[in-house]
Amino acid sequence: PVNEAGVERLFRALVGRGCPADCPNTCDSSNECSPNFPG
């Protein structure tokens, strides 16, 4: 099973910088809001 909290924390650490204001911690590598994470 996936540890969602751990995955989200890693995701934020990797791509959480330079994201749009409406989803500053949940964007993908293109700085778009990621549909796979709550934002």
Swiss-Prot record:
Residues the record lists as Proline amide modifications: P38
Residue span(s) of the pro-peptide: 1-16
Protein origin, superkingdom: Eukaryota
GO cellular component: extracellular region
Primary location group: secreted
GO terms, molecular function: toxin activity
UniProt PTM comment: Contains 2 disulfide bonds.
Record-given protein name: Conotoxin Cl14.5
Species: Californiconus californicus
Lineage start: Eukaryota, Metazoa, Spiralia, Lophotrochozoa, Mollusca
